[in-house]
């Protein structure tokens, strides 16, 4: 009866111990998940382990990235080899139609490009092997190390949880009265066991990470050596072929190509042209403004002139030009001219009166008579010109002989009768 009760008490204590252990472990997980600050001495004791874990994560990430890069590299090699082969075939096809030296050059270059494309595809073999080895390394070595790391993390969580449990039990411990001494010994024993398990796994993790890094270096050095050897052979063969083509085409006649790079002027030239156009436009605008101002001044001056002067054309009002144009009339209209006396002698027997009657009407000619008379005579226009000339400070001779002026109009109109100028129809009949 006593033995059964003792076993039952031990079972109850073991259940309580497991519950307490799970409680403190869960508390440690919560502290780690929330990022709360832990004991600095405990964290410092795991500094070497944390460094190894960083190396492991770096190896894991770089291996995954290397697999992706090798896949993309293979795709790019296939594409560039295909394009290079197409270019070589095109050059060979065009060389068959061209019998000149250019055709020979295209044929040689096309063969070299096709050969280079085939040799470039040889790089895919070491790359495929590298990809396979890296994938195997990730699936086996890294996965095995990751399993060990996960076990170590669980052991570390239990160990740190046991430390929290022991810290809590030490606060209730009273060595003098032996209170809670048994409980503290149990917790201390639990901490010791969890520490042993954690230290063992910690050592395994550090060794596996070191071995993982070394094995990766050996794998890459072996695989990349094969790739490097293949790549160097490819470039040596390609360079040799291109050198032979260059030597074979050394004596060919070179071709000079001129390419039109730009179809329009540079922005600087366009700016200069626009500036010149604006300058010319401004000069033209200035000239037009000057002409407009001069015209306005002419109109204002013309409005200030007398009415008789405005009745004449503007060109006739200029003194120098008027005298030059009608200088021959001065000799004809002078009182000493012989033509005036001859006209007077002829006119006296015919008209019965001196010809001075014709000239006596001269002062009455003006703008008013021009507007009121029903018959406009050229002599009146001439008299008007004489009056206008007098308005510009020219002497007015009242007894000028008009015969020369009549003869002038007779020459202009041969069919008209010069004797009828200045006489009415009755006077002509009486004559």
From Swiss-Prot:
SUPFAM superfamilies: BAR/IMD domain-like
Protein name as annotated: Islet cell autoantigen 1-like protein
PROSITE patterns: AH
A Pfam family annotated for this UniProt entry: Arfaptin
Organism: Mus musculus (Mouse)
An annotated GO cellular component: acrosomal vesicle
Region of interest (Disordered), residue spans: 295-316, 351-372
Composition skew (Polar residues), residue ranges: 356-372
Gene Ontology biological process terms, A to Z: spermatid development
Source species, domain of life: Eukaryota
GO molecular function: protein domain specific binding
Ranges of compositional bias, category Basic and acidic residues: 301-316
AH domain location: 44-247
Gene3D superfamilies, per the entry: Arfaptin homology (AH) domain/BAR domain
Gene name of the record: Ica1l
Xref: InterPro entries: AH/BAR_dom_sf, AH_dom, Islet_autoAg_Ica1/Ica1-like, Islet_autoAg_Ica1_C
């Amino acid at each position: 009866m006593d033995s059964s009760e003792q076993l039952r008490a031990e079972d109850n204590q073991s259940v309580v111990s497991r519950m307490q252990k799970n409680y403190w472990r869960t508390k440690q997980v919560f502290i780690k998940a929330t990022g709360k600050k832990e004991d600095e001495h405990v964290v410092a004791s795991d500094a070497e382990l944390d460094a190894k874990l960083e190396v492991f994560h770096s190896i894991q990430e770089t291996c995954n990235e290397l697999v992706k890069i090798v896949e993309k590299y293979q795709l790019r090699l296939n594409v560039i080899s295909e394009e290079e082969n197409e270019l070589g075939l095109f050059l060979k096809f065009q060389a068959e139609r061209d019998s000149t030296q250019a055709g020979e050059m295209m044929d040689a270059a096309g063969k070299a490009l096709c050969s280079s494309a085939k040799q470039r595809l040889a790089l895919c073999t070491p790359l495929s092997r590298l990809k396979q080895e890296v994938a195997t390394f990730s699936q086996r070595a890294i996965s095995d190390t990751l399993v060990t790391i996960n076990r170590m993390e669980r052991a570390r969580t239990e160990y740190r949880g046991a430390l929290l449990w022991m810290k809590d039990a030490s606060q209730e411990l009273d060595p003098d009265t032996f209170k809670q001494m048994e409980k503290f010994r149990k917790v201390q024993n639990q901490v010791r066991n969890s520490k042993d398990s954690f230290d063992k796994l910690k050592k395994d993790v550090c060794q596996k990470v070191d071995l993982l890094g070394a094995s990766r270096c050996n794998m890459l050095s072996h695989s990349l050596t094969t790739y490097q050897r293949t790549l160097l052979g490819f470039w040596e063969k390609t360079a040799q072929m291109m050198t032979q083509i260059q030597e074979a085409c050394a004596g060919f006649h070179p071709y000079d190509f001129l390419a039109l790079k730009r179809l329009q002027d540079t922005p600087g030239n366009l700016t200069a042209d626009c500036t010149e156009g604006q300058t010319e436009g401004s000069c033209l605008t200035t000239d037009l403004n000057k002409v407009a101002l001069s015209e306005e001044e002419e109109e204002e001056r013309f409005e200030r002139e007398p009415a008789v002067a405005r009745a004449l054309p503007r060109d006739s009002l200029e003194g120098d030009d008027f005298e030059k144009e009608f200088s021959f009339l001065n000799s004809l209209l002078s009182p000493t001219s012989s033509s005036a006396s001859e006209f007077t002698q002829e006119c006296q027997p015919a008209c019965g009166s001196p010809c001075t009657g014709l000239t006596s009407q001269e002062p009455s000619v003006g703008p008013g008579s021009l507007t009121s008379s029903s018959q406009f005579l050229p002599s009146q226009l001439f008299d008007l010109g004489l009056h206008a000339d007098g308005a510009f400070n020219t002497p007015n001779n009242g007894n000028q002989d008009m015969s020369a002026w009549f003869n002038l109009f007779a020459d202009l109109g041969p069919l008209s009768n010069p004797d009828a100028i200045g006489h009415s129809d009755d006077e002509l009949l009486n004559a």
